[in-house]
Amino acid sequence: MQTENQVNDLYPIAVLIDELKHDEITYRLNALERLSTIALALGPERTRDELIPFLDESIDDEDEVLSALADQLGNFVDYVGGPEYAHVLLSPLENLAATEETVVRDKAVDSLNKVCICLSQEQLEQYFVPLVQRLSTAEWFTSRASSAGLYCAAYSQSENPAVKVSLRQSFSHLCHDEAPMVRRPAATNCAKFVFLVTKQEAIDEFIPLFNSLSNDDQDSVRLLSFDIMVSLAEVLKSDSEIRHYLLQPLRSFVSDSSWRTRYMVAANFVKLAKVVGPSLIKDELIKPFVLLMKDTEQEVRRAIATQIPGFCELLDKRIVLEEIIPVIQELINDPAQHVRAALGMNIGALAPQLGKEKTTEYLLPMFLELLKDENPEVRLNIISKLEVVNKVVGIELLSQSLLPAIVTLAEDKQWRVRLAIIDYIPLLAQQLGVEFFNEKMGNLCMSWLEDHVYSIREAAIKNLRKLTEIFGLEWATETIIPKFLAMRSHPNYLYRMTTIFAISEIAPALNAEVIEKQILPTLEQLVNDPIPNIRFNVAKAFEVLKPVLAAGGDSTVYEQQIIPLLEQLTKDNDPDVQYFATQALEQTND
């Protein structure tokens, strides 16, 4: 007969088993989340003898559950008794690595690699390497595909030269596997494997593998082999060896019949350039770069556009001006808007390298062209990078060249473009000075307060405070405050609301005199507005004014003028108005 303690010991595993077999997937997922708690309750021995075998046998479930299990098992070494017993986790993970769903297999591979790090040499050779070999020679491609991700961990952990030779040979078979679904992960992992072998082994064994994969009949394999070339270039280091082994494959990549392969080269061009060194860049990489900029496929041109700043950093200024800038000028009028948008985001970064004179001569005209682009994303990208150019050429020159276009964009039909311009205004204002700003941009800033998009009105209000801090209180009192206060009588309540929001935003930059003479009369009028939203926002504005008046040492204005108005609002018919008015009064009493 079982004792009470024995029953209690069995209870957690019984509950877990019940929940793992539950019809509802949420119960099964919850059970897996508590797996470590159950393992702690069982102790290492029972976890090894009961829990792990049970999990191993129950691998026949929905992908979400299997993925969670694969993830959990990677962190289970301590629960089975530490590294000495880590190998007991390999069996369920091997089964998970053979499943059909890629997400599950990837999680299983990650967990197997975690466990591998904990294994002793004996465990590695007795359990892990045979597991890798079994998966590599399995009938189903899913197992072979998973095995590709295990070789780096096994190889780096092994200290046995014979085992290492065996692993390299087995990996070579994966790179020549009949299924492209296996060759793809083999190519991905080959780029990592290269760093684990000697330089001579890389030349003798991995360059032939690279040549095979880079000439694969499947473009999905070829494009993944580009990273192998980058890795090999880093391992070889020598200019002569890189020229001998990798130059022809690079030319083949750039002229590959598949645009997806060329895209991969374009998107990672700087990564390759940084590892081959200045001599090869100058002699061998400029022409491929230009060819990709002129590629027939727009996605390739877009990808190479993102590489322009990074690649040009590695070139002499003269080469940039002679070889790269003319092609950029062609791309400014590219028929694909995504290419132009990528240019807009990236060409500004050339300004520091080109310097003031050449930026003015070459980049500013291109900026102006892109600021007039029909696509809003292109315009937006250029605006977002104006500050980089400003640091090189100065705001005066920038504003002279681009101000007309900026003013036009301030009224752009796309609100995100208008918003980007608003964000840029304080920088312009600071550099241009008050007279120039009032003449060219003052009315523009006020017009945004009446924009039909709330985000624009909100940004415009925040701008008013920044401008007040730049130009001073006197300027604000004479120029902007009368204009936004005049909106208190606007027939549309949204614009009356803008007046209140502007008061709340700008108040900390004002003094008690301005508040008493200009702000309070407006709020007194709006206290009786027919719209409840207006009235309760007036109450919130009063709350903002208190610390400003207190800082000025004038509490009588608040006590004699504002408190009576708040008390009036506490008796309002609308409960929201009552609430915010009461809250403002309570703040007053603190």
Swiss-Prot record:
Whom does it interact with, and what assembly results?
PP2A exists in several trimeric forms, all of which consist of a core composed of a catalytic subunit associated with a 65 kDa (PR65) (Subunit A) and a 55 kDa (PR55) (Subunit B) regulatory subunit.
One annotated Gene Ontology cellular component of this protein? cytosol
- Protein's name in the database: Protein phosphatase PP2A regulatory subunit A
Provide the alphabetized UniProt keywords: Repeat
Give the function comment from the record.
Answer: Phosphatase 2A affects a variety of biological processes in the cell such as transcription, cell cycle progression and cellular morphogenesis, and provides an initial identification of critical substrates for this phosphatase. The regulatory subunit may direct the catalytic subunit to distinct, albeit overlapping, subsets of substrates.
Comment block on domains? Each HEAT repeat appears to consist of two alpha helices joined by a hydrophilic region, the intrarepeat loop. The repeat units may be arranged laterally to form a rod-like structure.
GO BP annotations of the record are: asymmetric protein localization to old mitotic spindle pole body; establishment or maintenance of cytoskeleton polarity; meiotic centromeric cohesion protection in anaphase I; meiotic sister chromatid cohesion, centromeric; negative regulation of septation initiation signaling; spindle assembly
- Its Gene Ontology molecular function terms? protein phosphatase regulator activity
A Pfam match: HEAT_2
Q: Where are the HEAT repeats?
A: 12-50, 89-127, 206-244, 246-284, 285-323, 324-362, 363-401, 402-440, 480-518, 519-551, 562-590
Q: Which family does it belong to?
A: Belongs to the phosphatase 2A regulatory subunit A family.
Q: Which SUPFAM superfamilies match?
A: ARM repeat (SSF48371)
Q: Reply yes or no: does the keyword Calcium apply.
A: no
